[in-house]
Amino acid sequence: MGAAKIWDATEVAEEAQENGISDIPSSSLAVDISLPLPRMKPQIIGLCKDLFKNWSQLDESCFLVETVSGGITNLLLKVSVREDNGPEVSLTVRLYGPNTEYVIDRPRELQAIKFLSAAGFGARLLGVFGNGMVQSFIDALTLSPSDMRKPKLASEIARQLRKFHQVQIPGSQEPQLWNDIFKFLEKASVLKFEDSEKQQKYDTISFEEVNNAVVELKDLTDLLNAPVVFAHNDLLSGNLMLNEDEEKLYFIDFEYGSYSYRGYDIGNHFNEYAGFDCDYSFYPDKDAQYHFFRHYLQPEKPQEVSDEDLEALYVEANSYMLASHLYWALWALIQAKMSPIDFDYLGYFFLRYGECKRRKEACFSLARSYLTRSGSG
C-alpha cells in the first residue's frame, strides 16, 4: 500500500506540472527544525502520513529518517518507508531554515521547480507543507569542490547548464540580479545587532562605498548585453549530484533560481571552485574556463567554438563574477542578523566583499578593453 501511494504521489506531481502547483498534496503542518533528529522524527513521520493518506495507518517502525545534508539555508532528510515485506520507498524532506524568506522567494522557487522538473532537472515535487517540501529521492552522491574542477565533470556541468538555461519558466523574464542586490543592500544597511562585537564590526562597513561598487558594476555589465536566461544562481558543489553507475549528473536545489544573466550563473559557479574554505586560488584559469565555455556553447562540437565567442563569454563571466561576490556578501549580512545558525556571516561578508575589491581592477580592465575593441564602450 505504501509503495503504491508513493508512485501515485509522483504521478500527482507530474500532472501538477501541467495543471498547476495546487494539485500537489499539501499540508499545513510545520516541522521544528531546531530539534535534534530523534525528536524531530515523529514530526517528520506525522507529516508524511498527513501528506500521503495511504500511509496514515502505518506504524512508526515502518519509517526510517536520516540526515542527508544540512545546508546554510535548509536541512535535507531522507525518509525510507517499508510496509510488511514490500519494497522500500524513499523520498526527501527539505526543511527551510528559519527566516530564509528574507533572502529567498519561496513562491518563485515552487513555480520554477514545477517546470524544471518537467524538463528533467532535479527531484520531482511530491508535496508541500508549512516550512518545506517533499521530493523524490535522487540516488546519487554530492560532488566535492575538487570534483567540479575535473575536466570531464566540468564539461558535463557545462552541457547540463546549457540545457538548464534553455528552460522557459512562465511569468516575467526580467533579470532579477540587480533588483535582488539592491533589495539586499537596502535591508543590510539598516541592521542593528544586540551583540556589541558584531555591531562594532558592522559599523566599519561603508554602505556608501558598497552602493557605489554595485552601481559601477551594474553600469559596466549593462554594456555587455549578456543573454538573459533562467539561472540556477547557486551552482556550488553541494547542489550537484552524480550517479556514477548511470553516469548521470543532477542539478538540485533551485532556491535562488531566477531569470538572470548567463555570465552571472557561470561566474558564480566558477567562484564556487574555491570550496568551503573560500580558497580563491582555485578560481579557474583562462584555459579551464575556455574548456567549460566550449562545452557550454557547442556541446556536440566543442572544438569548433570561435575565438570571438570564447572571448565574449570570458569577459561576461569574469565581469559578473564580481556581482556574485557582491550578492553573497550582502546576503551574508542579512543572515548575520536573521539566521540562528552558528556561522560567521559577518566574516563571510568581509571575505566576499574583499575578494570583489581585490579582483575589481583586473576585471574592469578586461571588460573595458573588450568593449573598446568591439565598439560598445
Q: Can you annotate each of these PLM segments?
A:
Residues 2-66:
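Juxta-kinase regulatory segment immediately upstream of eukaryotic protein kinase catalytic domains
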Residues 45-62, 71-74, 83, 213, ...:
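Eukaryotic beta-rich interaction modules
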Residues 66-210, 216, 220-228, 245-246:
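ATP-binding pocket architecture of kinase catalytic cores
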Residues 230-232, 237:
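Catalytic-loop of the protein kinase fold
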Residues 238-275:
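Catalytic activation segment of kinase domains across protein kinase-like and atypical kinase folds
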Residues 263-305, 322-340:
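Active-site activation/catalytic loop segments of kinase-like enzymes and analogous catalytic loops
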Residues 305-377:
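Helical subdomain adjoining the active site within ATP-dependent kinase catalytic cores
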